[in-house]
Amino acid sequence: MAASKNNFFDHVRWLRQAALDAGFELIIAGESMQALLRRGEYFWVLQPQFLASVNGVAQYTSTLIDEVTHFAGWLPDRSKRWPAANDKLIFKQWAHHAGLRVPAYSISTDSDMTDVVVKRAASSFGAQIQGPFRTCAQCLIDSSRRDYYEQFVDGEIFKVWYWNGAPMAAERDTMPRVTGNGRSSFRRLIEDRANLMQKCEPSELSHLLERAAVVLAYFGRSLDDVPEPGERQIVEFRYGSTLMSPRGRLVLDMRTNVNPRWDELREAGRLLYTAIPEDLRPGTLFTADAIYDGQHFWWLEMNSHPAVHPLAYPAIVASLGATAASRASSASAVRRPVPQTQPNFLN
């Protein structure tokens, strides 16, 4: 069974095995949820990350607060930031000049682009994404908030994890669709899909239906239409939507997958790594989002301090071990006296 970033025990299993393979002792703190990796007189503390919903807004936090909904993995450093990961417009400009494919976009309030979505340069977790729309006039942008139009690309959704520019894992998701049965309206089909894994809160369901209504309108349909038996219809396109089903996700182990089909992902990682300031590059995990249209990848954004995929732990831990070995005789080595007891850590 493929490892899942949404399964806490997959995180523990993969980190534990990576530690064993590298000759580390692993201790996880019950209070802080930090992970201590220790080998001889060298040790590292991996910082936990959690996904929380605070006042309806999704955000990462390093503390296990009451609003936490998911565990998001352990990172060597949560402080790294760089412009191309903080701002989607900066990313687009950089990626285009680097030779990566990016969807056409415009920051003009009177753009004549067609088939667009509206995004905000500094948003995350799919927030502030609207559309798709046939024309820009259907949704005017606010330049003061750094909104922009982006060409809507229909295809498979990819999120790729890179460690030091090398791909570790990728998730491939299909854009959520419903299938007609000749009796149920799109509204009912969407409600059924939203409640497939667990019952959806009324407020969230209402929000999902509002979004789906816009998507359906783009395709000339409405929530009250009844699709024909077997008719398939896209009802969402945002990554992370409740309408995305884990059953439709394919996890690719990019450490061992040599399929030429994914060469574009490998080359993109090499280029994206150079978008990170040189002094921040060593020991960096980042993700990149793309749409695969059946022939090529169209790159949307990159992210620092992302939710960790368990498949990345072997490379992360191996790098820490290599760092200790290479710095063993250096004054800058990560070398500290290890206390005889660790009162805050539990085996």
Sequence positions of predicted segments:
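C-terminal active-site "lid" helix and adjoining low-complexity regulatory extension at the edge
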Residues: 6, 243-287, 291-347
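Phosphate-binding site of ATP-dependent enzymes
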Residues: 133-242
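Conserved N-proximal alpha/beta basic substrate-recognition cap immediately N-terminal to
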Residues: 4-113
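A short beta-strand motif that forms the metal-chelation/ATP-contact edge
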Residues: 34-46, 115-120, 159-162, 167-169, ...
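ATP-grasp fold ATP-binding core
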Residues: 85, 95, 104-106, 113-130, ...
